[in-house]
């Protein structure tokens, strides 16, 4: 994507993902690379199963608390994962995270 994109994410509906308790708002999708930026909203007890990041991943916790590979990340935490890294994401209390993916890997629909 080579042009500017501005979105009021509050105007987007939360869509149910294929995983129970996880909804999403897709902010950006690059049709050429498959890269995307997505908001994920986790209900208490939700789990995003183990998956690989072929192109890496950037993640920012907007609210709540998530456990990734045994480590807890709370509101305001940022995490970068290099290409080919593997993880799962769990929350006991609920959370909203911003995920930026340079390449497609896990189907977030």
Language-model segments: residues:
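Short histidine-centered beta-strand/loop micro-motifs
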Residues: 38-40, 49-53, 70-71, 89-91
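A short, N-terminal "cap"/entry segment at the start of jelly-roll beta-barrel domains
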Residues: 1-34
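Glycine- and acidic-residue-biased ligand/ion/polar-headgroup-sensing regions
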Residues: 44, 53-68, 75
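Short acidic-glycine-tyrosine-enriched beta hairpin
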Residues: 68-88
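Conserved hydrophobic/aromatic beta-strand scaffold that supports enzyme active sites
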Residues: 24-26, 37-39, 58, 78-80
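Short, charged/polar surface micro-motifs in flexible loops or helix N-caps
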Residues: 32-34, 44-46, 105
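Ligand-binding loop in jelly-roll beta-barrel domains
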Residues: 22, 83-108
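Residue-level marker of beta-strand positions
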Residues: 47, 77-78, 96
